[in-house]
């Protein structure tokens, strides 16, 4: 959505660990993000698959770092380690099972959790609609109690404010 791109363009692109980008959709998404100067990728995964996928879309990724890691579980470990060491600011989920990635990211040894409860936010836009639909915690906080719901609500309201929604509607 243009409003999110406008907000993002006000900031410098960030280093991003791209986990298993060796499939068309993740690679195209990363290419779009690079073209918009949103991220500088570090590709993590099977080198041959990543290179072939980039070649298939006619994108020369030779100027970006590529860490050859053949096993899915190990790609998540490398991404979490890079984030923990401050070498990347974000982790981009490519073609990797969410539970595999989250299992690593949530490990205490990486110290990636902030002081608030972690929750999942899905920002969705609908054609010809100005307002986004933001859905939270489809799978991360299953059967939350009232206290957990309050944390989730705080996270999504804070997120909404950061993307320019002054008075988000919550249901």
Task: Identify the meaning behind each predicted range.
Residues 1-171:
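Anion-binding alpha/beta catalytic cores of soluble intermediary-metabolism enzymes, centered on
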């Amino acid at each position: 959505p243009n409003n999110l791109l406008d907000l993002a363009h006000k900031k410098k692109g960030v280093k991003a660990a791209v986990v298993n980008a060796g499939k068309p959709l993740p690679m195209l998404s990363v290419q779009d993000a690079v073209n918009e100067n949103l991220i500088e990728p570090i590709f993590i995964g099977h080198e041959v698959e990543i290179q072939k996928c980039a070649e298939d879309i006619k994108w020369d990724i030779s100027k970006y770092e590529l860490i050859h890691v053949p096993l899915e579980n190990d790609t998540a470990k490398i991404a979490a380690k890079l984030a923990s060491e401050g070498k990347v600011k974000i982790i981009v989920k490519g073609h990797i099972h969410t539970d595999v990635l989250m299992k690593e990211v949530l490990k205490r040894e990486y110290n990636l959790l902030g002081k608030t409860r972690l929750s999942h936010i899905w920002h969705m836009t609908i054609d010809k609609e100005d307002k986004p639909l933001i859905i939270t915690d489809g799978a991360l906080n299953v059967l939350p109690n009232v206290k957990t719901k309050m944390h989730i609500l705080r996270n999504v309201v804070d997120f909404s404010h950061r993307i320019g929604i002054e008075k988000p509607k919550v249901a």
